């Protein structure tokens, strides 16, 4: 009897190790695929929502106003994505003071994002729907072999070039890193008289 339990435990532990290794491999494959600084940011127009109000978001139009912080996240209302949305909401005024627009993108339908933009984004910044995954594909931000976007953040300069890219499953450094990249960009701009 005890031998059978040990065999089941060993089999279960082996299966868990295999899943953990595969997950690590998949995450590392998705992490290396993102577009790099200096690359041209693919233009897109999509449905977005701010404070529960749907609108059409155009990257080209947003870049006319300044840099864009484009961040991809796996799914609305999941723990890491909620933490990341709260952190971006808290930092939105700092991004705006630097002339930057923040937009989050996931594969969620716009109805889900209407609620997410109110409760988790706290009416501070827009989130966009990439239900057909064409935007995340163009930015190499699909989490390999899953139906989700990877957690990838970009800072895009007004000229459409990628200034900064960061991919990590943890939401911890996305806001701080993109804010630092926007601050660095702003410091390099000629001062108006």
For every predicted segment, state its role.
Residues 2-20:
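Bacterial N-terminal signal peptides that target proteins for export
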Residues 28-30:
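N-terminal signal peptide c-region/cleavage motif recognized by signal peptidases
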Residues 32-40:
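Cleaved targeting-peptide boundary
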Residues 42, 67, 150-152:
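Short loop/turn microsegments at loop-to-beta-strand junctions
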Residues 45-67:
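A short beta-strand-turn-helix
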Residues 59-86:
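Short active-site neighborhood of thiol/selenol oxidoreductases, capturing the structured segment around
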Residues 82-121, 133-135:
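Structural microenvironment flanking redox-active thiols in thiol-disulfide oxidoreductases
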Residues 149-193:
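Thiol-/selenol-based redox modules, centered on thioredoxin-like
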